[in-house]
Amino acid sequence: MVSAISTVLYVLIPFLVFLFRRIDARAIMVSGIAFYPFHLFLPMIVVFITGIPLILKSKGVYITLDGIGMENPDFSDALLVIDTMLFQIMLLQPFITLIYSRGVDLKIQDVRLILGTPLRRRILSSLFAFVIAGIALPEIVLLNFSGILHVDYLFFVHLIASSVFANLLVPSDSSKTSLVVFYLWVYIS
């Protein structure tokens, strides 16, 4: 269910944005890993590394040097946890691309895309992130209250807020600085 929703949203959202013409939809469409400059892919690694242990711990899964242990022997729960984390990453991926590719030239099929950096566009992209969060959270909250999955969805909100923080407060011509701020914000908090 989670995988199906994430797939639909990942395909549908760029076209909805394109229709409203508020954000450069091409910038979202090119957020596939194959087109990532390496430093744009790093935030995904950070999200995965920092998020998976937190969510697994909330489910009673613990990782030791000897392997993976579980207080609950139903390993399918752990797989559902990981699937949900991947779902969150897929939702965050387009928005993080918008943030960390500011001022970076992307070449796809010899088409040069330079993302705009005005404050107005950055504010719009931040609002877009909250729209994504509004779509994702009900699914995660539903899993919590139904007892299917106990996941710390506040961590997901925290990642959105971190991205918005880096997007609005860091100079628009410094994507590397944005990346450093994102790392610090996630690890410190």
Swiss-Prot record:
- Membrane topology value: Multi-pass membrane protein
- Where's it mainly located? membrane
Could you list this entry's UniProt keywords, alphabetically sorted: Cell membrane, Membrane, Transmembrane, Transmembrane helix
This chain belongs to which protein, by name? Uncharacterized protein AF_1268
The membrane spanning regions, by residue number, are: 4-21, 34-56, 79-101, 122-144, 148-170
GO cellular-component term (any): plasma membrane
Report the subcellular localization. Answer: Cell membrane
